[in-house]
Amino acid sequence: MTVLCVTGTCTGVGKTVVTAALASQANQAGIDVVVCKPVQTGTGIGDDDLAEIGRLSGVTELVGLARYPLPMAPVAAAEQAGQPLPSRDQLVQHIRGLDRPGRLTLVEGAGGLLVELADSGGTLRDLAVDLGAAMLVVVAAGLGTLNHTALTLEALAAQKVSCAGLVLGSWPAHPGLVESSNRDALARLAPMRAVLSAGAAQLSVADFAVMSAGAFDREWVATLVG
């Protein structure tokens, strides 16, 4: 299987724009790409990460499983909606059904690594274990990011989930000493796969495609497809 999971050190670090950029670059390279967001919350206020990924990346195969109207953590959103979360097995089988030889299947989580996506407490880390998938970690640039990133990497290592690298999801136009120092320190924790400029999601579709084409190392992207 060629499944890559995408998580963040917390919510709001740029998982969706990073997923879109990687999908766009792979798509432009002629790779068959599908993007899965198994659990989406906030649909009642217009949050639709899959639609945003499709708009920015040009990828047309966009797959979700569970959607809840309130912008809350999945467990709370499901409770408020009076609907169950999917089971861990349902999520795993759903994702496995998308994958095939020569295809890159990107799976974006909700919030951070250990946010519950399935009933009985299943998380994106659990899905990665079941799928044998690596995890790409989207990180912030500012204060606190080193601790958040180290904790995320430690949680991955505890379950022997491979870290595919880090991505800075929103690099400021005018970075200060803190951001520059953090960038260097983050690169010592795990390979830095890409650095996306703040505001990338506001680019036109054409400009986003240009940006994405060179965002990640092409040779690394090619290795993602089995």
From Swiss-Prot:
One of its GO terms (biological process) is biotin biosynthetic process. Homodimer. Belongs to the dethiobiotin synthetase family. One of its GO terms (molecular function) is ATP binding. It is an enzyme of class 6 (ligase). The gene is bioD. Transmembrane segments: none annotated. It comes from Mycobacterium marinum (strain ATCC BAA-535 / M). The active site is at K37. Pathway: Cofactor biosynthesis; biotin biosynthesis; biotin from 7,8-diaminononanoate: step 1/2. Mg(2+) binds at T16, D49, E108. This is ATP-dependent dethiobiotin synthetase BioD. Catalyzes a mechanistically unusual reaction, the ATP-dependent insertion of CO2 between the N7 and N8 nitrogen atoms of 7,8-diaminopelargonic acid (DAPA, also called 7,8-diammoniononanoate) to form a ureido ring. It is found in: Cytoplasm. Gene3D superfamilies: P-loop containing nucleotide triphosphate hydrolases. The keyword Repressor does not apply. ATP binds at G12, V13, G14, K15, T16, V17, D49, E108, G109, A110, G111, G169, S170. GO terms for cellular component: cytosol. It catalyses: (7R,8S)-7,8-diammoniononanoate + CO2 + ATP = (4R,5S)-dethiobiotin + ADP + phosphate + 3 H(+). Its cofactor is Mg(2+). Disulfide bonds: none annotated. Keywords: ATP-binding, Biotin biosynthesis, Cytoplasm, Ligase, Magnesium, Metal-binding, Nucleotide-binding. Substrate binds at T41. Its EC number is 6.3.3.3. Its main location: cytoplasm. InterPro entries: DTB_synth_BioD (IPR004472), P-loop_NTPase (IPR027417). SUPFAM superfamilies: P-loop containing nucleoside triphosphate hydrolases.
